[in-house]
Amino acid sequence: MKRIPRKTKGKSSGKGNDSTERADDGSSQLRDKQNNKAGPATTEPGTSNREQYKARPGIASVQRATESAEMPMKNNDEGTPDKKGNTKGDLVNEHSEAKDEADEATKKQAKDTDKSKAQVTYSDTGINNANELSRSGNVDNEGGSNQKPMSTRIAEATSAIVSKHPARVGLPPTASSGHGYQCHVCSAVLFSPLDLDAHVASHGLHGNMTLTSSDIQRHITEFISSWQNHPIVQVSADVENKKTAQLLHADTPRLVTWDAGLCTSFKIVPIVPAQVPQDVLAYTFFTSSYAIQSPFPEAAVSRIVVHTRWASNVDFDRDSSVIMAPPTENNIHLFKQLLNTETLSVRGANPLMFRANVLHMLLEFVLDNLYLNRHTGFSQDHTPFTEGANLRSLPGPDAEKWYSIMYPTRMGTPNVSKICNFVASCVRNRVGRFDRAQMMNGAMSEWVDVFETSDALTVSIRGRWMARLARMNINPTEIEWALTECAQGYVTVTSPYAPIVNRLMPYRISNAERQISQIIRIMNIGNNATVIQPVLQDISVLLQRISPLQIDPTIISNTMSTVSESTTQTLSPASSILGKLRPSNSDFSSFRVALAGWLYNGVVTTVIDDSSYPKDGGSVTSLENLWDFFILALALPLTTDPCAPVKAFMTLANMMVGFETIPMDNQIYTQSRRASAFSTPHTWPRCFMNIQLISPIDAPILRQWAEIIHRYWPNPSQIRYGAPNVFGSANLFTPPEVLLLPIDHQPANVTTPTLDFTNELTNWRARVCELMKNLVDNQRYQPGWTQSLVSSMRGTLDKLKLIKSMTPMYLQQLAPVELAVIAPMLPFPPFQVPYVRLDRDRVPTMVGVTRQSRDTITQPALSLSTTNTTVGVPLALDARAITVALLSGKYPPDLVTNVWYADAIYPMYADTEVFSNLQRDMITCEAVQTLVTLVAQISETQYPVDRYLDWIPSLRASAATAATFAEWVNTSMKTAFDLSDMLLEPLLSGDPRMTQLAIQYQQYNGRTFNIIPEMPGSVIADCVQLTAEVFNHEYNLFGIARGDIIIGRVQSTHLWSPLAPPPDLVFDRDTPGVHIFGRDCRISFGMNGAAPMIRDETGLMVPFEGNWIFPLALWQMNTRYFNQQFDAWIKTGELRIRIEMGAYPYMLHYYDPRQYANAWNLTSAWLEEITPTSIPSVPFMVPISSDHDISSAPAVQYIISTEYNDRSLFCTNSSSPQTIAGPDKHIPVERYNILTNPDAPPTQIQLPEVVDLYNVVTRYAYETPPITAVVMGVP
């Protein structure tokens, strides 16, 4: 018999008295699912299954039926299955008993129509004119007998309908029936919520995440667990302020250092002690007998040598000291530090490298004097000869020993000696403090002038350095304004005024200085990702530290939990997108790294890595590829890749191959070419630039996609940052105070921000979702997709479209502010070129630094090969990381923006070294110009510089030689300023002789912007030039002799110094009878006892005797031969040779004039040590000066100087009235001009001709507090 058709969901026992309806227990739904393989119809997104169950009539019928129930129903044992599995009373069959029961039930229902009309629900008329009734109340879910009273069953049904359990996140886990809760994973029915939770746990799902689809449940659980401890979702408020501040500055340069000692770098040293007979011992040593300290050494011979800071009292050692031994010792090491290989003689140096070594020595001299003279206070002197002058108080326990040296006029004795005679001739009142009150406004004055021992060169260097720092000094008012500007007003900065102004805070820097330093940084990066990537990582950490945005991936999972999917779907869009966004094998710091990349789009190009693109181009029919496209489309606008729009377009074009065709104008770059390959402007398809070329009929989706890109791609904007008027700006291709952004910027809400769906990135996401909905709706592209899958995909896209993420609004409002706040403090300032959006002609194709000679500055800009597809360093980012951040951003509860940023920014600006990077830029600029100045002295670079040292021999340095020299300069600068990281390293590679720096920025249309930063001037370079000019006159003080030497026998009893020989012993090229030995000269030995003949430079054969001139190079190349052939003629005095040296180090050997002395051993040893690549210090034999009569013995000299080279001699027999025998020198009054000449102005100096050894020294009482010590910040 045919089954009776049913309309109700329950079963009937066939008995008339079992007609009361019961709530549906869900088993019918299971049968429907089993019968309908295609799955149930898709409901509207967001509609829960529980709401669907509430709308069914079965439940309402139960409520109506239970209102009038007065007695329990009878037990129905006939509904129990028999041994064969047949159930009685379930179906109407051929058995007459079942038919009778059906007829009886029909009559009973007709009889009680008026009474129980609201209690019974009829079905359509079935077979044999029998109506199907609802399930009997005495039959349970499985058809067995139900012994529970009706009241109990009514309470259970009511509690199942009106649930008292708290609301759950996402979809309700079951459809409730009168008997329990059904699991949507396996359709099992549980009878209590606790049982259901335990059962769901057995599926591996968390109780509060049970969903309609088991696939979604599993992916959400995995998604949340994978993100649980990821660093990107951790709140970074626990990051220590100190660690954060370390990201903002590298080494703090040692810019300001103090010296409380004597300001002098030249030391008077005794060379030969005084030798006096016993009968005049008391007369000569009068001062020492009465313990009277002398201002000068009491010796037979005293000389001036270089010894920087020999009487200093410093707070920091720059470790650049130049210490020259007395000339009686060998100082050759000072002239062989550079460009001398290890194979050279230990006692020799290369004469062709003398100039480079002298320049390096002078640089060290300057660097070791970059101190400020510390004001140490005064005390009135009570000795009679100073007339109560205020003398400076020195720190330290040995201060007393310095007073006689500092103030020579404090000494006064009736003794007759050169020292006492000098002191007696001095101006007595030029001692101690000069013309300045010590107190100013109740405190120590800023500066004071002091008469004391000092050398004019050191005073000048320190004065210029002080002036340089004074130009950098900023007052509290400027600090207040600058910090407020840099902090974008989020930190209130005030500067209380004090009655004193003796603060030195050198933080002001010019734009030119910062630009030069910026170019050096860009050269340092080059194409090296290992240099720029840590910079971006540090900035990303800093952004995470100060940003209120929190990445909470549960926002995504909660949103996906509301997606309704059928449990029979083989594909789950929600599960697929969750799987795509898991952090496995990905660097999910890419989001904030992408933001950091906005600051450096001129030197680094952030691109989406190839793994984020659909594999092998992808297909529009693949669900996985569609989600790859969605993720990629959302992430691309946040990169700095100027080709990102066309990559977004070509990604979909790759997927549409075979479905839609677009006209491509390049045979290589076709529609099937991977989208990531379209990375240069010349690869952009013409149809993308002119979307009218895309047919809306043949390619409607791609036409729509191109229109979306052209209309909704984010628009670039800008924001103000920094304080260029005070702290300068390193911007090169943008205005000084402008920070460029690739997206639109809107003013931030200073109070509590609210969710905003009107920003650019949200609109962009919405358009991408709408495009994908058009794709899935079209059966042409998804022919195999079921309606259930399409509906699920549309629901997922709708949820993603309206996901409540704060990230888009954060990027438009707060992210620009954060970048603008940290940008002024970064060790690497922003380097940007304009963002171009979709303007292909303005796409940057080249940004590069050129180094060239100044006379070829018009050479074209760098021409990069076509294989260089990005500007600067390409940095690949994971699109999934960016998309997760875009979809899962949230703010802390009760966020007040201005309060948050005040608390977050204040610790950074409260760091004591926050702007030390500005000082580093100043040092970099100084170092660059110093290097350029020094290299110009040893090579031809067209750099306009005075060449004071051209008389010192030097090669014309090659690129490699100049690079070695530059490396030493770099090391010296880093040592002096206590820097450990890179300074001039980018200039060491290549050719340092190319002294002109320039930077070019070229666009695709061929337009080139060329920036040549102006050199603002270098104090260190100027000081080196000053020292070189002084060296040009005072070379003997530095251990160098000028001119040539003459080798020949000279025997005499006259006690003269070979450094100042008699004029009749000197000859030159213009002297009659002098022959020149040139490169083409030849020696012809005589036959049969005849004397050898030499062809001189004129070609004449002349005897080898008399006066000859040899170039040093020729002697070096033939040293062994000349030594063997010429020594006999030199020793006999028949031959005298002048070797053209130019400049040479020398060494003095003093001898007792009362005894015979012969210098041949010194001369022959020196000749033997000459090699083709080195010469030793030239030895001179000098008699000891005597203050009494002696019997002089003969002395044989073999080497004499051609010029006067005895300027380093300070005094002879200083403790005696006069010198009787030997070289005579009184204390040089010309070096004490202001002390001995009352008509000389107090501040007069005689540089560069003479180094004064007594001057007016300006000493300073400045405080050098950090910026944070003079301002008060209120967070």
Swiss-Prot record:
Tell me if Zinc is a UniProt keyword of this record.
Answer: yes
Q: Where is the composition biased (Polar residues)?
A: 118-149
Q: Which UniProt keywords apply?
A: ATP-binding, Capsid protein, Helicase, Hydrolase, Inner capsid protein, Metal-binding, mRNA capping, mRNA processing, Nucleotide-binding, T=2 icosahedral capsid protein, Virion, Zinc, Zinc-finger
GO cellular component labels: viral inner capsid
| GO molecular function, a single term | zinc ion binding
Compositional bias annotation for Basic residues: 1-12
Any single Pfam family the record assigns to this protein? Lamba1_VP3
List the residue ranges of the region (Disordered). 1-149
Catalytic reaction equation(s):
ATP + H2O = ADP + phosphate + H(+)
Basic and acidic residues composition bias: residue spans: 18-35, 75-117
Which cofactors does it use? Mg(2+); Mn(2+)
What EC number(s) are associated with this protein in UniProt? 3.6.4.13
Where does this chain mainly localize? virion
* Function field: Inner capsid protein that self-assembles to form an icosahedral capsid with a T=2 symmetry, which consists of 120 copies of VP2, with channels at each of its five-fold vertices. This capsid constitutes the innermost concentric layer of the viral mature particle.
Q: Which family does it belong to?
A: Belongs to the orthoreovirus lambda-1 protein family.
* Name of the protein in question: Inner capsid protein lambda-1
Its encoding gene is what?
A: L3
